[in-house]
Amino acid sequence: MAPHKSDDVDAEAELASQLAADVAAAESSAATKAKASSASSSSTPAAERQPFSILDLSEPTRKAIDAMGFKTMTEVQARCIPPLMAGKDVLGAAQTGSGKTLSFLIPAIEMLHRLKFKPRNGTGAIIISPTRELALQIFGVAKELMAHHHQTFGIIMGGANRRAEADKLQKGVNLIVATPGRLLDHLQNTKGFVFSNLKALCIDEADRILEIGFEDEMRQIVKILPNDNRQSMLFSATQTTKVQDLARISLRPGPLYINVHADLAASTVSRLEQGYVVCESDRRFLLLFTFLKKNAGKKIIVFMSSCNSVKYHSDLLNFIDVPVLDLHGKQKQQKRTNTFFEYCNAPCGTLLCTDVAARGLDIPSVDWIIQFDPPDDPRDYIHRVGRTARAGNSGKSLLFLLPTELGFLRFLKVAKVPLNEYTFPSDKVANVQGQLEKLISKNYYLHQSARDGYRSYLQAYGSYSLKRIFDIHKLDLAKVAKAYGFSVPPKVNITIGTGLKTSASSSSGSGGKRKEVDVDGEGEDADGEINPKRQQSDRRAYYRKNHQNGGSKDHFRKSGANATGNKGGKQWSR
C-alpha cells in the first residue's frame, strides 16, 4: 500500500510483504497487458465506439489514458463512465472481459482530483475485490491511471503485512483497492485510519464476493462506512437475490441499472470455440496428459475442483517432465503472486488452478481453457471460459464430463452456452496407466499427494449443488482411483452433511458432504505435512532408477507425443 507517490512505484511496498523485485516488474508488465485487454474487449465494432476524448476528463487522467494507448471506449465504459462522473449510483451487469475496470476507476480518480484530496484527508475511494489476484490487477491499472495525479493510493489484502498496511493507512491513502476480510479488519481495528471523508465505494464482482462467503463482512463494511453524500457503484455478472440485497443496502435509492449485452443470443463471446468430451473417470488423466503433450506450445488454463487436486497434478506432471504452474488458495500469498505474474507474462505454458483464477482476471493470450472438473453452475462455466477469447482474440475451451454428467449440458443450453461434442480415438490417447500406477506405488511423496487429491476430489464432488447430475453415489471409485494412479481405491475419510464422516474405499459411491471453504472459496482438507527429507529421498531414488534402467519417466515422455483429438475429423490443436 502506498501513502506517498514515491512509494507507489513498487508492488512489494504496496503488498507490504516484501515481495521480490522481479514480482514488481512482472506486475507492471502484466498490468499493461491486462488493461489493454480490459479496454479493447467489447462486442461493439471499433468504428462505432466513442472516443475517450468526448469525456470531460482532467489533464492528468487524459495523459495517462493516452500513455496507456486507449483511444475508444467499450460499451460498458461508454454507458457507465458519464453517469458515474455525474455522481449517480450505478448497478452494472456485463459480460466478463467487457472492460469494466476502467468504468469505475476513471470516475473514482476524477472525483479525488476534483475534490483535491490530500493524504491528510484520508480515504476518499474504496474498491472492493473478491480475490487477491484481482485486487492486484485492479491496483496495477489504478497505478498507471494515477501516474500524473498527486493523490495517494494503495492495496490492502489478506496475506500481506498487516502492520505495514496500518502504518500507511495512518499516513493517509486516498484510493484503496482491498479484499473484504482485510478491509473489515482495518476498519474495525486500525487506529488513525481516516475514512470519514469517503466519497466513492465500488464493489466489483459482487456475486463472487457473496458466493465465497463474504456476505456478513460486506454487510458490516457497508454499515461502518459513512453514507452521507457517498456515491456507490456495484458491478456483478449475475443479479442474484443476495446481490440485490447488497445493492439495496449499499446504493442510494433509484440507482441507474446498466445491463450490457443482455440481448445477446449467447452468454459467451462469438470468438470462443467451445466443446465438451465425454470420458470415463479412469481415462480422464490419460486424456489430459495427452492433450498437454500435444499442445505444449499453447497457453492453457486447467480448472480443477480442489486445492489438493491441483497440487497433486502439478507435482505429478512436473515430475514426469510436463512443466506446469499451479495456483490455489492454500498457497502463501508470495507464491500466489509470483505464479500469477509469471503466467501472465509467459508466451505459452499450462496453469493448473482452482476457481481462484476464474473471475475477472485478464491473463493475456490464453489459447485453451480446460475444465477438467466441471463447475457447479453455468455462471461459473461462463467465468472460467472468459479467461480466453479476450481483447478481440479467439480462443477454445474443452469441458470434461462423465457419462453420468451429461445432464449439465441442458443447464448450459438454458444459459445460452453453445457447445459441440469433441471425440477422440482411443488409440491416440497415451496408454501410461501402468507406468502411472507403478510410479505412485513406489514414490512416497507422490503417493501421499495422490491420496490427498483423491480424497479432496470426492469431497468436492459431494459438495455440488446439482446433485441430480453430480451424484457422488454414481461415481465408480475404482475408476476414480485409477485416475489418481491407484490400482485399488485407497481408504480415505470424507466429511458428510454437517460434519459426520465416512470412509470411501470401495467401487460404490459414498454419501454427500459439505466442503469446507477458505477465504478464496476453495476446499481446505489437508491431512498433514509431508516429510521433506522423505520427499527428497524418493526423488533421488527415482531419478537413479530412471537413469540406470530407462524407467517409466522416459515412457511418459514418449507417450502422447503424436496424440490427437478430433472434432468432426479436425485436430484439437489447429
Swiss-Prot record:
ATP binds at A94, Q95, T96, G97, S98, G99, K100, T101. CDD domains: DEADc_DDX18, SF2_C_DEAD. GO terms for biological process: maturation of LSU-rRNA from tricistronic rRNA transcript (SSU-rRNA, 5.8S rRNA, LSU-rRNA). GO terms for cellular component: nucleolus. It catalyses: ATP + H2O = ADP + phosphate + H(+). Residues 271-440 form the Helicase C-terminal domain. Residues 530-541 have a biased composition (Basic and acidic residues). A motif (Q motif) lies at residues 50-78. The Q motif is unique to and characteristic of the DEAD box family of RNA helicases and controls ATP binding and hydrolysis. Associates in the nucleolus with the 60S and pre-60S ribosomal subunits. This is ATP-dependent RNA helicase HAS1.
